[in-house]
Amino acid sequence: TRNAQLTTFVSSLMVLDAVERLGIEPSFCAGHSLGEYTALTATGALGFDEGVRLVCERSDAMFHAGNDNIGTMAAVLGLDDDQVEVACRRADNDVWVANFNAPGQVVIAGSPEGVAAASVIAKELGAKKVMPLQVAGAFHTPFMAPARDRLRKAIALADPRDTEVPVISNVDSLAHNTGLEWSSLLSAQLSSPVRWKHCLLTMAELGVRDFVELGPGGVLTGMAKRTVDGARTISVATPEELDKLLEWLDTGTPRVATQHEGEHLFAVERLVVSPAAGVFVPLGEVHDGTHIAVGTVLGHVGEAEVRSPFAGVLQSYIAVDGERVTPRQPIAWLRTV
């Protein structure tokens, strides 16, 4: 959904912001599916505003494409990539490999009938387990072609820039730092399989052994361990986990970053988070573009008021009216200067 994608994107960049202040800089960046937009914003190929607009356009386009072509996805565990592709071909229906995540971890997607047929065949071929996924469409398959066409126009307007730090593409698992290349790669990603395993192997071939996952989840860390022999991995989900990262890097004194090509959030972008679990209801008179003072009530979660601890301009609500939220889940995005 739009809100889930935007929340993940902004939350990941807030962690990146904290890491950058320590002077920790990457040799390469990569992101799984939506995470590719975070990686491009981190390296400066996209500005923060451009990234937000593209993520919103992408999620909306995927939602409508999913409604036009009803589809589903399933994780196939314990079967080689080529055998999963055989299962899809033998199903003789609309079903394809959508994610090559790690050795023995592949996701298929397509029509409900196609995924069901391929799942049965995958088990016959020796899959240890096939797990249906609760998703709103057959992402990264030809079912997303309408979304790809719509997103292509938005990407052209964003005009991705060249970067010094290369980003590994989901589409071809190669390192790219030319903005013009990303104009086509990002739109192709929607209807092409995510070659995440191959992205990890590309980084390993380029000499990467330390993999740091930033943002909510922690799933990619496990994939790196399964894919790259001798990989050192760590997941940093929140800025509060920076001490863990410093210890992992065996750094006694934080270094000061002298140069960074990506988008600095620092004191500019802020998230207002939920004070409790419950159903969020925004205040009707507070809209996008409203100037917010410290302590302004943006809405309620149950009986708890959602107050902004920052002054700034409301850019967007991340949670929608009636959405069930958890404590500290992002509710709104403000720009403070």
Question: Across the structure, where does each feature detected by a protein language model lie?
Answer:
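Structural motif
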Residues: 29-32, 98, 214, 301, ...
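FabD-like malonyl-/acyl-CoA
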Residues: 1-84, 129, 133, 210-239
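Alpha/beta catalytic cores of group-transfer enzymes, especially the acyltransferase/condensing modules
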Residues: 5, 43-191
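Acyltransferase/transacylase module recognition
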Residues: 1-24, 156-257
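Short phosphate-engaging motifs
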Residues: 80-83, 114, 220, 241, ...
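Short, well-structured beta-strand-loop connectors
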Residues: 35, 286-300, 321-333
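Acidic, low-complexity mobile loops and tails
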Residues: 257-316
